[in-house]
Amino acid sequence: MRSEGSPISISLGRYGVWRHETGLSPELAARIESLGFGTVWIGGSPPGDLALAESMLDATTSLTVATGIVNMWSTPADEVAPSYHRIAAKHPDRFLLGVGVGHPEATSDYTRPYATVVEYLDRLDELDVPVAGRALAALGPKVLDLARDRSAGAHPYLTTPDHTRTARERLGDGVLLAPEHKVVLDTDPEAARAVGRPRVQQPYLGLRNYRNNLARLGWATGDMDDGGSDALIDALVAHGTPEQVAARLDEHLAAGADHVCAQVLTADMQAPEKDLERLAGALGIA
């Protein structure tokens, strides 16, 4: 059964930007908003005070901010819930609390992960964080079911349109599906892989929950070892012209996503304003 709540009332738009918390700022959020993207996703494990999210909302007028994700192991529900309520009161319908259990290699305390997710969501219920105001990091079928029944929907990370298709079948209609996809705006495949491969290899190809998900999608162990095969890297990191990359993002929408968030990778790791501008033009949102 779905917990008490209503369908998501937050508008994410069709396209968003996913970026690690260390590379975000209120100024960049304002620029992203001006380019026509609907949502900024705060990557990493932002702390429970949600100060960065609040500062980006303060600096913008219509942009939605989502966490991708607050880690259940490091941030108790009792810590993040008051922050959620503070922001939701100040910026109604502009903040989505994305939460997740992370991965077992990240903490020595990683035990009973599924039960931990359930207990965390139970506590959010007790603290009046609405179902419609939260999303769940989800890859496998059991957690996708939780995302469907206990949150506004799922935020899968490091996936492909094939996963989006199967996730939509699992979630059914009317449930948010917002996958992340990495992109490099470079038409040279070797140069693009040189940027994308390290961001996939470390740490994700060494983490069993991501490897298990890729295996479910049909990728062989050999594709995941030694930095990832070219075919796997190309599937997980879209590259090419802005128009080619936009078409790859649209494959998620065609497969059933409501929203797709692009993680724009650059060789120098600097804020990718120029690439975001080019991508926004190709997506037709600028």
For each of these PLM feature ranges, what is it?
Residues 1-286:
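Active-site-adjacent structural elements that line small-molecule/cofactor binding pockets in enzymes
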